[in-house]
Amino acid sequence: MHLTADDCEALSRSTEGLSSLTQPLNQRRSRGDVNRGLQPTHRTRTQPGAQGRQKNIMDYFKVSQRQQAVAGRTKDISIKEEVLDPFFAEDDESSISSVMETSGDSSSFLENEYMGNSRKRPLSSTAPGRLQIENDLWGEPEKKAVVVHPEHSQIKQELDDEIEIEPVPDSHYGLLGTRNWEVPQGSIEDLPDEVLRSIFAFLPVTDLYQSLSLVCRRWRIIVGDPWFIPWKKLYHQYLVKEDMALRRVEQVLQDFAITGQHKECILGLIRCVSTIPTSRNVDPSAVLQCLKGHHLFSRAEVCITNKLPHLQSKTGPEYMWAIITAMVLFSDGVRDIQRLMACLQRPCSSLSIVDVTETLYCIATLLYAMREKNINITNRIHYNIFYCLYLMENASVTAPQVVEEETPSSRCRQDFWSSSLSEVKLTHEQQRILNHKIERGQIVKIMAFAGTGKTSTLVKYAEKFADLSFLYVTFNKAVAERGRLVFPRNVTCKTFHSLAFGSVGKLYKEKGKLNFSKLSAYSVSFLIQNREGQSIFIRGKTVSQTLENFFASSDEEICEEHTPVWFKNTHGERKLVTPEEKRINVEEAKEIWRNMKKLDGDVERKYKITCDGYLKLWQLSKPQLSGYDAIFVDEAQDCTPAIVDIVLSQTCGVILVGDPHQQIYSFRGAVNTLYTVPHTHIYYLTQSFRFGPEIAYVGATILDVCKGIRNKTLVGGNQEGDVRGSMEGKITMLSRSNFTVFEDAAKLAGRERQIKIHIIGGLVRFGLSKIYDIWKLSQPADEREKANLVINDSFIKRWEENEGFIGLKDYATRVDDKELEMKIRIVEKFKERIPELVQKIESSHVLQEAMADYLIGTVHQAKGLEFDTVLIADDFVDVPCARDNNQRRPQFIIGMCPEDEWNLLYVAVTRAKKCLLMSQSLEHLLALAGEHFLRVELMGEAVKTGVACSTQQCTQTLQSGIRLVVKKLPLIHSNGSRDMGGYLCYSCVQKRFGSMTPLAFLPALQEEPIVL
């Protein structure tokens, strides 16, 4: 059935017609067919002169009258295709086009935006019809044989001769496709604009502007209509800071007193939302009746009745919207808002989904603007709304992405490698990547948050473009080996060092000139001259750093830019490297590098080339990786400038994949390639399949508060999760340093009941035997000889005959060797307990992770992995205390901490799948975003009599006459300490709840609305 503009007007005058088209599932149950007259009718006869003939939509309901076809009644409304407007050019970071005219008065702006809805007849709110089980999904219900009288048959033939029926699509308008053996009889193009608007409203705004608006002129007009999803457009325009959006939102904030100068600005937000124009068919009382089943309804009702009583007396929808807004503000998480939306989708509710989503976008816009204006309000509410809307707009892909066959290893650790990648259901973001075919010379960036399926995206990309040849390169050998198992045959998986070894490194191995370990200050000290100035060990450190910086750079020669800026003197004090010392460092480094490069060099003096050294030689040879159409660079955020130079010198296409917030190897010379390298195309993966909203919120808040990332938000799926103390599955303890790893291992191994532990990476890599050797070195020589304590490590054994433990400690301080200093600290702390602890840790340690009760490790070792439950140690960045505490140290500034430290914390948090136990410092960090784990409850539900405030050192008591009370939820920290939570007094709430406080405390009724 085709609908013209006249048909839509006629349809708007019919409740049955409008509701059948826009809400086909919400029809009143009846014995008859509620869609009678609306189902497409297949033509039985065509008359040449009747092209363009279409009857008024109301004529299809006049079943009692004989229909007469009059050719040429309607004009041909076919739309001529136009050249695409560059206004809709594809650029993910480009601002969303302005489709709404600027208005000086925000109230009129809101009214104009909803004029299209307010002047149309509202939708029906009847119950959905009964589904027939025997109906075929793709076709019509099986029709029973009917005996027709011959005279009736003749009448039907005459009607067929007289009535001209225009070709129409199938009953589903092509939305469900067709059987393989059927010829399509229609498509989505045949749907009326009213239905297309309802469909388009559910799509992400990026798809609307970068895909749908480019299909045809008709769709572009729909998307660009200022009456079409105005708040959704405004929200995304405000996020990218379009001037028009900034002005409009600022006007709204001023008109409704949503500013920092107004203590009750949150009430202004509610008043603003309550003014949203609503369809006349919406019955506010029926909607409120649907909401009564929600646990937040009674709290919102008490709040609005006491704070904004004038809204309750109005007969319009203002009170309804105020209740909904209060419920959103009181929501404890994403699921509260999802339940709210479910209540509003009940048959008794006459609100459309678009009405609800537009309201949520309105609230989200105002909340986001409040934080931008530094108004004290938690970021949790905005995050909950954004998360809920994101899942709704991407509803077809919110299920877990990869189905992995369970193995003993996968039960405790998942790293998303799977042989079932054919089961992958692509997200909108992933599909956009697959829609782009890489060309020669293109540089494509894929900015992928933690757990967003970047590997499976690359696998599907290679499968789609099977005619192309790809090279997948990474830094980790194990990752490359796993890649060979999951990528199709047109992908070659290598590490950068393996490529360099095949070309350069193998030559040095054959000559015995390959050193598989890194340069150390100790080894370099034997290759340099003992000159006046720095001590031999300190200069060995600065020269080794100069070489490492040169290896990581893209430069061809060693220069002073590669020398370190700081060094530690013999007293452990940081000093600037003088120009003279820089000159000496360059001279010594050049001499070592010249001897390293010689294949026939002096092996006895140990001028052996390192792995980074032959990688540097390979880079300087300007290699060309021929035979590939494109290169996948995994973990691109960890690329050094030398590797970047190799990649960018290729003529084929390049796809850089990684998470810029997981760069934790800058100390090795890595640069954040995803920020520094120019690109031709950029895509984002923001939805993680690893965790649910609770853990996703913590990760997103770290990026928000610590790194200022707000334009792209990390979200997860619908999985259950917890961050307040629950534990499920295998427990993993992640820390910043190996010192804490040893402490945790010692505590667990020292328990009476034997506990099986596994240190991620293994005991050898952890260096447990070196710790034992350092303890042996710390013992007097006669004691070592008496107890037959033999030092096995060659480096530590060298100090046995020289300066002993004191000399080793002095060396570690001078060369600033963090790992060695950490091991010495362990020995000094545990002293004589070291042999016992080492023995217990070794006996408790198991090789297989699946056999362990606890997994222990550093973030660097756990990068790329995921675990059921993660405990965050308290050795990360120390955030002193929450912002409401007057004793907080004022010198703590977020920006003073290195970015790598925040990245480490972000990586640690995003390893968790189900449960996350936070440190107290991490809880304090969330408090900087206004999140204190508070909940508003009815006083009657909480306590019957007045109770004391649960805050320590607070002596106030809650008043017994108040209707609402704020409760701090209990929380267990990763170190085992418990915050029991409890009810808070007014002054304590005011410190923590910020601008939300007026909603929770009701001192007096406001009989009249506030005049602005």
UniProtKB/Swiss-Prot annotation:
Pathway: Protein modification; protein ubiquitination. Its EC number is 5.6.2.4. This is F-box DNA helicase 1. It comes from Gallus gallus. Transmembrane segments: none annotated. The gene is FBH1. It is an enzyme of class 5 (isomerase). Its main location: nucleus. Residues 1-54 are annotated as: Disordered. Keywords: ATP-binding, Chromosome, DNA damage, DNA repair, DNA-binding, Helicase, Hydrolase, Isomerase, Nucleotide-binding, Nucleus, Ubl conjugation pathway. InterPro entries: DNA_helicase_UvrD-like_C, DNA_helicase_UvrD/REP, F-box-like_dom_sf, F-box_dom, P-loop_NTPase, UvrD-like_ATP-bd. GO terms for molecular function: 3'-5' DNA helicase activity; ATP binding; ATP hydrolysis activity; DNA helicase activity; double-stranded DNA binding; single-stranded DNA binding. Pfam families: F-box-like (PF12937), UvrD-helicase (PF00580), UvrD_C (PF13361). Part of the SCF (SKP1-CUL1-F-box) E3 ubiquitin-protein ligase complex SCF(FBH1). Residues 12-27 have a biased composition (Polar residues). It is found in: Nucleus; Chromosome. Residues 427-692 form the UvrD-like helicase ATP-binding domain. ATP binds at A448, F449, A450, G451, T452, G453, K454, T455.
